[in-house]
């Protein structure tokens, strides 16, 4: 049995309780992108290109306007962080699926 010290997070404590039960759970991946992105950017390559163009526009805006601290820049930075994390998760999931397909080819 694992130690339940107060230094552990709630997630770690929950994981310990689930593991102690000895049950297996099915993992389901739900779509994380808004429906608009799926229609506008149907492929993973299109989403990566969209992100790349966004970074170029930010670089251009910084070059033209300098380091301006405004709400627009903050919103753009937050959206880019969100899209980056979503795309990295998509890449990880695709890598897992490709690896699993490779394992099931025998």
From Swiss-Prot:
The record's principal subcellular location, in a coarse class, is host cell
Q: Which gene encodes it?
A: TRM2
> Which keywords does UniProt give here?
Host nucleus, Viral genome packaging, Viral release from host cell
What is known about what this protein does? Component of the molecular motor that translocates viral genomic DNA in empty capsid during DNA packaging. Forms a tripartite terminase complex together with TRM1 and TRM3 in the host cytoplasm. Once the complex reaches the host nucleus, it interacts with the capsid portal vertex. This portal forms a ring in which genomic DNA is translocated into the capsid.
Keyword Acyltransferase among record annotations:
no
Keyword match NADP:
no
Subcellular localization: Host nucleus
**Pfam families linked:** Herpes_UL33
Protein family membership = Belongs to the herpesviridae TRM2 protein family.
Spell out the GO cellular component terms annotated for this protein, sorted alphabetically and separated by semicolons: host cell nucleus
GO BP annotations, alphabetical order: viral DNA genome packaging
**InterPro entries annotated for this entry?**
Herpes_TT2 (IPR005208)
Subunit field text: Associates with TRM1 and TRM3 to form the tripartite terminase complex.
The name under which this protein is listed is Tripartite terminase subunit 2
